[in-house]
Amino acid sequence: CLNRVVAQDVLSKYNNPAGDNAAFDGYAIDSKDTNNLKKDKGRLFRIIGIVAAGDKPNKKKKQKFQTIEIMTGGLLPKGFDTIIPIEKINFYPNKKNPKFILIKEKIKKNDHVRFKGSDYRKNDLIIKKGTIIESNHILALKTLGIEKIKVKKIPNILFFSTGNEISN
């Protein structure tokens, strides 16, 4: 369908991403738990699980000073509002078998979070009628799971000249 003309507007059928999710591998926390932290005295946050992309997050109520490991694309569980990238994590007692992470400073809300519908909102215009389809349109269609769209029929054109008035 590359280089074909779109016959009708193509709209997003749903939000993409479908929910707030992690932009990086890391640990999700509630930023409010870091409000009173000072650099000289950190706070341990208990690791309570892991969320991978495609997992449905646990709906169990989060306790104060808890964290959950989260993979890129993993949906943010209820009660968590920010992601600390894995590269910035201090593990306790050690990296090989961590039970806690150590946080030594205030963390801003919504860091490294991709919000529901931040790429496409439900009913967003993806491709306008009359547009010639390019490769970036195909990426958007694939991202949204749209496999078929209506395109205009390729016209059959025949050129034929008569006479010698168009020659030298």
Regions found by a protein language model. Give the residues of each.
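Phosphate-interaction motifs
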Residues: C1-E147
